[in-house]
């Protein structure tokens, strides 16, 4: 499998925990980072996320368009897990854009019919990003980690995947089915 991601630290930490669970089940993971995930922010340094991913997976991070393009055609991965998947990445996927390592990895794997597992983490999931989520549901080979509102009282538009369900979602996606129920009670 391939693990790609971009997002805020709480979601990145949850994604790393899910990746550890996948590794514990024997999955080999190839890490892919978006350009944005490699940036330093007030939440942490991009090099820190890179080092954690490389240490966890035992592989260098794929962070260029050239590095991810052959993933599908050369059958280097069975699936792509985008964890976390931000509103910006949802928009790019919905528009069919392949201008980041994560979105080009998705295009590369879709070319050969491989599943794309999306772990949503966005503050506007019930706002502007809601339309993009709906568009991806209508396409073949996209599967969602079950999700819910992560803080309905303070951030009523915000959605976050139940990252602990990522391994089961990946297994279901490889069988061609969506893990249900996809809409969950609020995630805390």
Regions found by a protein language model. Give the residues of each.
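A cross-family phosphate/adenosyl-ligand binding-site feature
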Residues: 1-116, 121-188
